[in-house]
Amino acid sequence: MRLSDQSRQIVQATLPVVGEHIQEIATRFYRHMFDNHPELLDGTFNRGNQVEGTQRQALAGSVAAFATALVNNPDRLPERLLSRIAHKHASLGIRPDQYQVVHDNLMWAIGDVLGDAVTAEVAAAWDEVYWLMAEALINQERGLYSARGVRPETVWRPWQVERKIRETRDVVTFVVKRIDDRLVKTSLPGQYVTVKVPMPDGVHQPRQYSLTAADDGEHRQFSVKRVRGDGKPDGEVSNHLCDRVQVGDTLTMSLPFGDVVLDDWRPAVFASAGIGVTPMAGMLSHLRHAGSGLPITLLHADVDEASFALRHQVLDDVRALPNAAVHVWYESGADSALPVDGVHAGTMDVTAVDLPDGAAYYLCGPLPFMQAVRSALIERGIRPQDIQYEVFGPDLWQADFRTEPAPGSGEDA
C-alpha cells in the first residue's frame, strides 16, 4: 500500500487547509452521517462523545494524521495508529461495508466545507488516502476477528454480574461470570472489553472498560468510574452501571481487544493517574498469577488515598511479587496508611524514584499527565519505543497531527 506520487503532492499541498478546517469538516460529517444513518447511534457510536466533540476530533484528525504519515514516510504505514483504531473497531463489531458509509459522508463534508478548493484532482487524492486507510483497517480487523473465530456480529457474549464492589465514592468494580458455553477467548493483560448497555430511550450505548484482573476462563472483572457532568450532562452509561445494574443482572460484553498489552518477559514500570490505574491492575494481577520475579514498579498519582481505586487489590498483588515497589503521589499531601515504598505530595515526579534497567513503560491517565510523564522519562534517557500508553475514549494524541508524535507513531523511534 502506497500513496501515488501525484496524490502525495496534492495531499501535501492541501494538508494545511484541511487541518485549518478539520473541526468544521468533522462536525458536518457526523451531522450528515447521523441524519442519513441514525441506526449508527444504536450500539456503534458513543453519543456522549458526539456531544463533547471528542469523537469528531479523533476521526477527522486520524485521517489527517494518516495522510501526514503517508506524506512524510511514503514507504511505511503508521502501524500503531492503525492498530489502535482496528482494536477499537473490532471491540464494536465494525463491518467492512460501514467504511463506505463513512467515506461517502466524510468526502461530502470535505467538499461542503472547502467548496471550490476541492477540485476533481484534490477529491481524488483524498479519496485515495481514505481508501488506503480503510483497506488497512479492514485487513487488520479481519485478522482480529479471524484470530478469535468470530464475525463482526458475533463478538458479543452475555455475562452475569456476580459481584459489585464499591471501590471509592465514584468507582465500582464488576465481577461477571460467563453464562453460555461458547468459546471465550482469554484476554491479554492490558486489554479491554466493550460493554453495550440499553438506555431508557431504547438506544444501546457502548463503552470500553479495561479488564482489572487476570482471566480464569469463567470470570472477568472491570471497573467503572462514574462520570459527573459538573454543569454538563452526567455520563449516561457510567451512571447507569453504577446505580442500576445489580448482582444477577446480565451484561452484553465484547470479546477482549486492545493493542497495549504487557511484555511479561521484561521489567515493567506502570505510571497511572486516577482511574488510569485500571489497566495497570489487570497487568499486575497477571504478573502475580504468573509468579513473576521480574523487577516491577508502580507509580500512581491521585487526589488522595480515598480516591485511589483498586488500591487494596493492587497492593496485595504488589506484595505478592518479590521484586516490586510502589510509589504514590497525592494532591492532598504526603500522607498514607498503605504499605507503600514512597509517598509524595503533589504531582508525579519520575525523577524522584529509582527505575529498573531495561524496563517497558506503561502510561494511563489524563492526556496532559501522560505527555508530561513521557517527556520526563525521555529526558531521563528512556527510549521512546519503550513507552506505551492507553487512553480512555477517543485517542486525541494519535489524532493530533500538528503536535509532537504520539508514542509508537513511527516518528519517535
Language-model-derived ranges and their functions:
Residues 1-156:
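Globin-like tetrapyrrole-binding proteins
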Residues 198-202, 255-260:
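Short, charged beta-turn/beta-strand-edge "cap" motif at the junction between a beta-strand
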Residues 190, 276, 366:
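Short, conserved phosphate/pyrophosphate- and ester-handling motifs at nucleotide-, phospho-/glycolipid
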Residues 261, 269-289:
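Phosphate-binding glycine-rich loops and their immediate beta-loop-alpha structural context
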Residues 150-250, 302-304, 329-333:
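Ferredoxin-reductase
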Residues 208-218, 263-274:
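Short, compositionally biased
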Residues 299-413:
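Reductase modules of NAD(P)H-dependent flavoproteins
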Residues 267-269, 297, 360:
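Structural motif
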